[in-house]
Amino acid sequence: MNSAFQNIRMRMDWVKELPDVFLDRQIEQKFRWLSILWIMALYVAGVFFWGNFLNWTRTPLDFEDWGIINSPRLDFFADMFREDKLPLHMDYPKIEGQEHPLHRLTDRYLAIPDVITTPQILLLKFLSINKFVYIDILINFTIATLGLLWFRKKYELSLLAYGILFLLFNFNGYIQAHYAVGHITWGGYFLFPLFVALVIQLVEGQPNWMWVTKVAFLLYYMVLVGSQHHFIWALIFFGVLALTSWDKLKWIIAAGFFSGLLGAVRLLPPILIISHVYDEGGNRLLPGYPTIVDVFRSLAILVQPSEQNFVRSDVSWLMHWEFNIYVGLVGSLFIIYFGMISWFRNARRYPALQKLFLPTLVVFILTIGHLYGFLRKFHIPLLDGERVPSRMIGLPLAVIILIATIYFQAWLDEKPKMNLLVVVLSFSMFILIANDLWAHAEAWKLSAMRTAFGPVQMALAGSSVGNHPDQPYFTVIIVGTLLSIFTGMFLLFRSWREHPLIGK
């Protein structure tokens, strides 16, 4: 009888502790299976989310930048595999009243900095463009998940804190909107958790060649995924970080320098079209967010994709996908309180995170109005390639979401266990954030976008590979390839010298 009573009591205690498993890492240790199940469930939910967002690859990618820019570019690679040719020159007709996949600047495909050249492009030999897009998003989403798990481990995030972080980072309006309109090259956004993790490692420890190698290869992949913009923002972030980390200056410079050299195979060919870009006005600077108020409105209010001038900039045709950072009202309050107010009020709690404040602030400021024009005065081609400053908010948004979650966990740790109010409030936040992000996805998913904007003209029939003799172009590609290879070998060698695997 006593034994049966004890079993019932133990089960009741188990049920009683269950809510706190999601809020307290110590209690979580008793339920390891639940931790694994929760993390896997979130990942599977993400796979479902992006599949549903893409309408399970059924929606034709023939609208907005999908149809104008990226479907023709991906079809170019598919043609390359069908014909066993190199991806050198693109032969695509100019369609009246429509942008060209290579922006009417050149037929040299690799001279355009924001085209995808990742290893997974090989999948286009077997997959349709729609299926490739889904797989490509899942690959980058998986990389983001690994980065978020690094933060969970380092800052001992509870299951619920990790869940909120997972939702806010992976499914916010910023990344949804860019994929919705056809910016497949926005995969670099998913690399930001690992980038911020490397910045924290720099600030907290003694950097070395292994750290430089990690940064260089991460940013190299960022370039390969077509995220030239994100690469630039990361370099700006490093540049400002150097001002507050003089003792790490040489390592920051080394990371930026070797990132550029490693990416030479993709960063050198655009040199050939710089004069055309300036002559054609292809890099004309557009305005960012008119005011800070517009930033907070874009954070909290769900705007339909076809709605114009919600953010009233100087350019009336700029659509909301250039300003969208939606996380909903609850998500906004979460970010503002824990990611801004708590960060400022309790900065000393996490000394390493203090170093992130100035770079995050500077990149954010550059998204406002015409302030990015200050950097354009230096006439540095890499910086001049940034023409829509509001897009840069992706990096500070990622940083603040990460920091908000860290301070949210600190807040949880200060509360007494089994506090009903804390449990209800925390779970309510998770549910409401999930609901708001799903509502946004329903409004911005590809099928809704195609209905709102309709198809454009595309010329995907026949071959778009039009290779021809072009010695300057070939020379630059060869030089860039050799620089990338030798830089990669050098970095791996220096890393091996620091951490030799043989003889241990």
What are these model-predicted stretches?
Residues D13, I68-H89, K94, Q98-H100, ...:
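Periplasmic/ER-lumenal interhelical loops and adjacent helix-loop junctions
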Residues F5, T59, L371-F374, K415-K504:
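Transmembrane helical bundles and short interhelical boundary loops of multi-pass, membrane-embedded
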Residues M1-F53, T142, L482-K504:
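Start-transfer (signal-anchor) and selected internal transmembrane alpha helices
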